[in-house]
Amino acid sequence: MDKIIDISNSKSKIFQNLLKYKAGDKEEGIFLAEGEDMFDEAYKSSSLLATIVPNIYDKRYVTKKTFHLKDELYRQLSSYKSLPKVICMCKKKMSDISSLGEKAIYLDGIQDPGNLGTIIRTALAFSYSSICLSYDCVSPYNSKVIQSSKGAIFHMPIIKEKLINIKKLNYNIFITSLDGEDEKNILSLPSKSILVFGNEGHGVKKENLSLGRKIKIEMSGIDSLNVAISASILMYRFK
């Protein structure tokens, strides 16, 4: 049976918890995702715990648990200039190293949430099996990551692990580096392969560079590309 909980006090414990979930990088195991498309993807992936709706709301977004907020409170939860019709309370689903699969992406120190969200979305589009993050990456549940992933965050296994531990599982590791060989030398990725992309400013960490075969995209006129663009090119190349 659907249940609507009215919240009108900004000091209420429930509302204060919702504000914590908005950050997405806390340890509560819950994050917020905004908009109709996110509602659909969260529902399909069984990640949806509850919905949050504004003062005037669409009954379509009333679920087993729905928080009904005054607009001034709803606005505090939203990152959008125009208020979305629904905000979804979702459960985090971090995977472990056993979920890497046959063809994965490793991100070493990625800091820009837009880059991470774009890479997650592209990896899903080109049928990569998982995204593995170093421990110093931006949180995959940052609101900007969620928005730029366009819902892909709900369908792509996300893992946090050290690259050295993946090496121990006998993965074929291909590391993007300015001093790498031309990626055209590789006809296709063998089974159990992982593509590694580094931090926007500093690239892959020094201690990780020796863990695999270094490759690069041959370019003329410039030294490097945005990491999300580089990742998209290579993911398409080796899909």
Language-model features: where?
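Boundary-proximal intrinsically disordered activation/regulatory segments immediately upstream
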Residues: 1-55, 137-138
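Active-site regions of enzymes building and remodeling cell-envelope glycoconjugates
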Residues: 61-74, 102, 171-173, 188-194, ...
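Glycine/small-residue-rich loop that forms an oxyanion/phosphate-binding "nest" at active or ligand-binding sites
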Residues: 66-94
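RNA substrate-binding interface of SAM-dependent RNA methyltransferases
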Residues: 94-180
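Structured adenosyl-cofactor binding patch, chiefly the S-adenosyl-L-methionine
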Residues: 122-126, 137-138, 142-154, 206-239
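Active-site/ligand-binding-proximal alpha/beta "capping" segment
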Residues: 175-223
